Swiss-Prot record:
CDD domains: NAD_bind_m-THF_DH_Cyclohyd. Pfam families: THF_DHG_CYH, THF_DHG_CYH_C. Belongs to the tetrahydrofolate dehydrogenase/cyclohydrolase family. GO terms for cellular component: cytosol. This is Bifunctional protein FolD. It catalyses: (6R)-5,10-methylene-5,6,7,8-tetrahydrofolate + NADP(+) = (6R)-5,10-methenyltetrahydrofolate + NADPH; (6R)-5,10-methenyltetrahydrofolate + H2O = (6R)-10-formyltetrahydrofolate + H(+). Transmembrane segments: none annotated. Keywords: Amino-acid biosynthesis, Histidine biosynthesis, Hydrolase, Methionine biosynthesis, Multifunctional enzyme, NADP, One-carbon metabolism, Oxidoreductase, Purine biosynthesis. Pathway: One-carbon metabolism; tetrahydrofolate interconversion. Catalyzes the oxidation of 5,10-methylenetetrahydrofolate to 5,10-methenyltetrahydrofolate and then the hydrolysis of 5,10-methenyltetrahydrofolate to 10-formyltetrahydrofolate. The keyword NADP applies. GO terms for biological process: L-histidine biosynthetic process; methionine biosynthetic process; purine nucleotide biosynthetic process; tetrahydrofolate interconversion. NADP(+) binds at G165, A166, S167, S190. It comes from Ralstonia nicotianae (strain ATCC BAA-1114 / GMI1000) (Ralstonia solanacearum).
Amino acid sequence: MTAQLIDGNALAKQLRTEAAQRAAALTARGHQPGLAVILVGDDPASQVYVRNKIKACEDNGFLSIFDRYPADLTEADLLGRIDALNRDPRIHGILVQLPLPKHIDSHKVLEAIAPEKDVDGFHVANAGALMTGAPLFRPCTPYGCMKMLESIDYPVRGARAVVVGASNIVGKPMAMLLLQAGATVTICNSKTRDLAAHTREADIVVAAVGRRNIITADMVKPGAVVIDVGMNRDDAGKLCGDVDFAGVRDVAGHITPVPGGVGPMTITMLLINTLEAAERAAEDAALAA
């Protein structure tokens, strides 16, 4: 068996085309979707991520504001800028690129973003809403993973899903979205005993640890869907995920590649979250008129 690839680039292109059409309709009504991205410091990976986000906005008819600050920016100044963006009617989404310098409290910064503009879905109000099944925003990476499952018409209801990784950014919200879709979900973490015993029983495996080859072929149930969220480098410096792609591909039914899998979907769902925020703002403006 050779797994079918879930092509994140192709799916992202389709969803971005739809988002661009919705953005154009909003812009025609005077409500162009707007995203503000804040980068503090000069982390090379962060610069690449931010550049890709800004380009995605520009390519799809979104207003984008890029605020770049030196690493010695004070926490107070950053909070002041976020407050200004919270009050800016042109901006519907605010994203602070992580990680932040050590002297800045990331939690305090993320909580300063107005929940209705928290397009990453990290604010405690949005995380809590996700728990209740009525999220204002779904975190971008898990949201993209769910769209990938949807794209192959996978019957999530009743499936056994294992999420490897328990971060607030991917693992926990991924588990919640799968649970809400009707899956029976297990979350594995660094303390999990016999990881393979869990993954071998799974119909869906989501790997989100940031450790190369943590999922190998002998750990995967034949025919399972394997979604690789990891972003690592192999010994030759080539981009790779958390999954031993060459081996697992011969066992799984569907698999996402790295690169070209979850990555493009994450930025796409950021656009969609921003678009949905703009649509809500337009509705509120119409009601207030």
